[in-house]
C-alpha cells in the first residue's frame, strides 16, 4: 500500500464544490471515479480543503491510498489523460502513509478578483465578480486592514479549526487584459 499526493487545479464553474454529494457532480467525485478506473480499485481521495459550488482552485492538495504499480510520480500524467479539461493534476508523488493534507498543508491563499468597468467581459466573466460602479481602492484597503491578525470564527468552523490568522491582504489597482 502506498499513499499518493496530488496537487489539483480546477475551474469549479461546472461543479457543485469539492466534496462528494448525492446526485451532484463534484471535483472529489470526478477524481474518485477516474482514479478508481485507472487503478482498478475503489478509491476515495482525501482533500486538504473543500471549495463551494463554482469556486476554482490552484494547488489544492489531495491524497489517496492504492496498491497500484503506477509510480506516484507518474500518476499526474496518467490521470490528466483521463480527466476532463477543467481538472488538472499539477503534480503527484508518493508520500508517507501517515501524511494527511488537512493537517500538513494548513496554509491557504484566497484570491477574489473584481472586474471594474462599464460593461462585463464575457471572455473572463467566470473568473471575476463584475462591478460597474467606480471602486475606491484606498477605502477597500482601509476596510481590509480590519481583517488582518488572528480571529475567532467559532460560529463558522468545525470544532477543530476555530482560530484563523490572516497575515496579508493585497489590493491592487485594476489592470486591463488585452485579448
Where are these regions (language model features)?
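Short catalytic/ligand-gating loop segments at beta-alpha or beta-beta junctions
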Residues: 154-164
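Amphipathic alpha-helical interaction segments
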Residues: 23-26, 161, 170
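A general structural signal for well-ordered secondary-structure junctions
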Residues: 150-153, 177
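Generic beta-strand hydrophobic packing signal
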Residues: 48, 92, 156, 172-173
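Short, flexible loop/turn motifs enriched in small residues
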Residues: 1-2, 166-168
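Catalytic/RNA-binding core of pseudouridine synthases
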Residues: 1-149
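Single conserved hydrophobic/aromatic residue that forms the stacking wall/gate
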Residues: 169-179
